[in-house]
Amino acid sequence: MKKKFKLQFKVGKTFKDKRGWLKKILDGNFSSCIEIYSKKGSVRANHYHKKDKHFIYIIDGEILYFYRDRKKKAKTRIKLMKKNDLFFTPAMQEHMAYFTKNTHFLAFSTRKRTQFDYEKDLVRVNMQNYRKVKAAITRYK
């Protein structure tokens, strides 16, 4: 039986002591971790990856996240992701991020993020022209 797609994952509890604190965000085999800061009102992604899969962990801010499974020709779905949220993007899933606030996040990828490798695996789309996406962004402007 095929596993159902899971978008959002739980982050571990914060452990505190006199030295400070620690929190497990994610276990896994990753080829890269990118730290990204995006300004309110900006758009990132707007593409899909042929093979790469990645997790996003939001340190601070909010992302209005749009996603659609290309293999199943599914409808576009929307989810508001907030501080401390962890979510997954599989290969072949169109995705776009609209930042409703200034946002600081980490992207954990299964493939190398050299520009050459990244561009070779990437297919650009134009999700901001989808009617549902336009309507959702308009509500946040």
Predicted regions and their residues:
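N-terminal leader/capping segments at the start of a protein or of a new domain
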Residues: 1-17
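A short glycine-rich, His/Asp/Glu-containing loop-to-beta-strand
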Residues: 12-46
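Short beta-strand His + acidic residue motifs that chelate non-heme Fe in jelly-roll/DSBH
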Residues: 22, 46, 65-66, 89, ...
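Tight coil/turn sites that cap or link beta-strands
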Residues: 38-41, 83-84, 90-92, 102
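His/acidic/aromatic-lined binding-pocket segments of jelly-roll/cupin-type domains
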Residues: 47, 53-58, 79, 86-87, ...
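Glycine- and acidic-residue-biased ligand/ion/polar-headgroup-sensing regions
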Residues: 51-69
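Short acidic-glycine-tyrosine-enriched beta hairpin
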Residues: 70-91
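Double-stranded beta-helix
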Residues: 71, 100-141
